[in-house]
Amino acid sequence: QKMGTGPWTAARVCLAAVGPTEFAGWAQVGDEYRCDENGCNCGWVYPYLPGEPMGRRHPSPLIQIMATSDDQVANIWRPLVSMIGLGPLKDLLLPRGEFIRIVGTSGDKDMDRIDRVTASAQSRLGAPINEAFFDETGLYTKSNKLIEVFTTMRRGAAAMGGRSMETTNAFDPAQNSAAQQTQESQRSDIFKYWRDPDLALKRPDGKPFSFQNARERRKILSYVYAGAAHINIDSIEAECLELMETDSSQAERFFGNRLVRGGGSWLPPGLWEGCHASAVASAA
């Protein structure tokens, strides 16, 4: 929560739109990437090392950004538009209200663009996209029908040899969200980044720290927000204390980065899985 994933994703969108994200062979002595040869006048030049993978722009990018609502999409869209207006990409990326035109080479009005997708705005769903960005996938569930939208966009990207990326707060393990399905997947081609405090912080007896313990909670927050200079831990802890008065598990998920079931759970975490026949057999 409040780590700045929206602006970070916006930067990734810019890269997917006009950056050297497509494999262009292996570098030899003297090879380099020059922005001025790719429509950008920022003057940046990158000299490749021999044997290094080289990159090129996608010739006809079609990118979609998805979230649960317009307000949620705006967490990425606002910084994206600001980056374009205040940086060197304003000649390559042209905001047009509900979409952003990418100055490309295909000349196809249905390509070379960045679109926004929400539960209520799915008109471009099913398009052959090359990159998809999903925000707050911990809220995409079967009940709100966002799992279906999520998988449809994933299929569209896969068909074009594209990629997808998710950002989210820690999910509720009782909801079987898109984020949970991705986290639990065993596929080796999925990169997952999650600072799990329970793997790094333990008591002498091996038990995880308690979020109810003030000293241990502070250590959890310091670990989770390490490297985020813009975060004030005192402010985060104050918000935690207030939220814990009404929903302690939500405070642990949002700020402690822990996978904690909501207050309405009918079983403690791990109890059902631990009683599965295979688990009992392995413990015997």
Give the predicted meaning of each segment.
Residues 1-284:
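Phosphate/NTP-binding elements of NTP-utilizing enzymes
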